[in-house]
Swiss-Prot record:
NCBIfam families: L27 (TIGR00062). GO terms for molecular function: structural constituent of ribosome. HAMAP family: Ribosomal_bL27 (MF_00539). Residues 1-11 have a biased composition (Polar residues). The keyword DNA repair does not apply. PROSITE patterns: RIBOSOMAL_L27. This is Large ribosomal subunit protein bL27. InterPro entries: Ribosomal_bL27, Ribosomal_bL27_CS. GO terms for biological process: translation. Disulfide bonds: none annotated. The gene is rpmA.
Amino acid sequence: MATSKSGGSSKNGRDSISKRLGVKRSGGQFVRAGEIIIRQRGTKFHKGKNSGLGRDHTIFALKDGIVEFKTSKGRKYINII
């Protein structure tokens, strides 16, 4: 017979993989058309001039230019100028 009781199972030991969200190109940086500027969950940042919004709320450049972050009426916009 076993001389020690069986150990209890732990409910820890899990971790999800990181999603690599965040700002990929800073303000004042040059971007080419199609480059990702921000990966986000929801619209923390909104698309502005010459930038597009993907179905996962990714903001990307529609034209070559300089990234500009702008705040208007409590919303943060991303423009390509």
